Amino acid sequence: MKKVLPVPKEFKPGDRFVAVGTLPLCEGCMLKERCEEYKRGWIYEVKGKVGLVEHDCKVHGKVVMGEVEEVGIPLILPKRLAIEGATVEYTPSKCTNKKCPHWRDCTAPWGERVKVKVREVLEEVQCPLGLPLVRVIGVPVEVKRRTRRNIKKGKGGHGKRGLAP
């Protein structure tokens, strides 16, 4: 989805960045509300610059209004699921190695059983545990929530008794 939002003046069409959200420095800025439209953690691609007026920014120096497109969220999947264009069921890793440089992308906080469309396969990841993993850009499509009511009705996805097969 394309949006017109503030981008640093030096960004050019095709540049990508990860939105980190607004900072305490942003208090009182006239563009703060526009910057809050960025989804924290998402990758955006600059499609073009729309505005000619440069605005002062305490974080980036100068910004202009630019057309940006949501690309997706960086995450790490098992290699067997990393197929460009595929929609897969994503469950975050239970890894507890918070010192691993890939930990954040392996344990994305979306919850369990999220349908994710793999937009782009980026690279293989060297997992300290030796697991075959790949970094991708994904877009959440649907979240399936198991409720007690669905399990009792047999719609929990685990057979008639609501148990794992």
From Swiss-Prot:
Pfam families: UPF0179. InterPro entries: UPF0179 (IPR005369). Coiled coil: none annotated. Belongs to the UPF0179 family. This is UPF0179 protein Igni_1272.
